[in-house]
Amino acid sequence: DQYFKLSEKGTSIQTEILAGLITFFSSSYILFVHPVMLSEAGVPQVLSLLATIFIAIVASLTMGLYANTPLVMAPGLGMTAYFAYTLVGGLGFTWQESLGITIVSSLIFVLLTFTGVIESFRLSIPLELKKAITIGIGLFLVRIGLENAGFLLEDGFNWSWIGFIGLLIVLVLTLFKVKGAFLIAIALITAIFWIFTDGLEVSSTNALLELSNYFDLLDIQFSNMIYINGLIAIFSFVMLLIFQALGIVEAFVEDREEAKKSYQVVSVMSVLSGVFGTSPAITLS
C-alpha cells in the first residue's frame, strides 16, 4: 500500500486482483487475433504469438511497477493493422523490413518522450481532441469485438448468438451491480462455447523447433527505409504511436508524474516489440 498507494486511490488488494482477472480475460483476445493478422503479412504465427506473450508480460509488469499505473500493455490491433495492411500490403515492404521501420519509429518515439517533446505535444492538443482520440480507439476495439463475436458477418453460419448472450449477461449483471460482471460473463460464454462445439483445434506446428530458430526467423532489415516510402512510413508510424499513447494515457492517468512514466514505458516497449518480432505494444486499458 505504501508503494502503490491503494488506499489513497480508493481501492484495495481484493479489488485490484478482481480487476486484474477481468482485464486479463477481456484482453486475451489479442493472443488469437494478433498472430492471425500478422500472418497475413507473412510473419510466422508461432513467432508472433511468442513475441506477443513475452511483450505483454514484460510491458504490463513494467507499467505497473515503474509507472504505478493500472494499464495493461500488449501489441495493439491498430498498429498491427498498419503493419500488416499498410506497410506490407500497401507499400510493399517485407515483414522483416516493416520490423525495421517499427524499431526506428519507436526509437524516435523514445527520443521524443525522454526529451519532453511529447509533453509539449500533449499540452498543445485540445481536451476535446484527446477525448475524441480515446473514443475512436474504443470504437475500433468495439468493432473488432463485434467481428469476432460474429455480429458483422454478412453471410454464412456463425456463433453470433453466443456473443449476444454474453453481451446480455454483462448488461444484466452490470444493471444489478454484480461485482465481476465481465469475468462471470466470460466464464459462462466460454463454457457454452465448449459445450456446443468441439472446442479449439490443436495446431500440429512444432513450436519448440520454431522457437530454437526464433532470431534466425526474424532477420530484421533496415535497408529500404532510407527511401521516400520508408521515410513516409516512419513518420506515419511515429504519429500513430504518439496518438495511441495520448488517447489511452490521458484518459486513465491523472497524475502527471505517473503519466510521464507511462509514456516512457510505452516508448521503450515499442522498441522491444520490434526487436522481438511484433508490432508496437500499446496501452490497451
Question: Which residues fall in each region the model found?
Answer:
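Hydrophobic, membrane-embedded alpha-helices of multi-pass small-molecule transporters
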Residues: 22-26, 159-167, 179-185, 211-249
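Small-residue-rich segments of transmembrane alpha-helices in multi-pass membrane proteins
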Residues: 27, 79-87, 130-143, 187-201, ...
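Membrane-embedded alpha-helical modules
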Residues: 91-196
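N-terminal signal-anchor module of multipass membrane proteins
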Residues: 1-68, 86-88
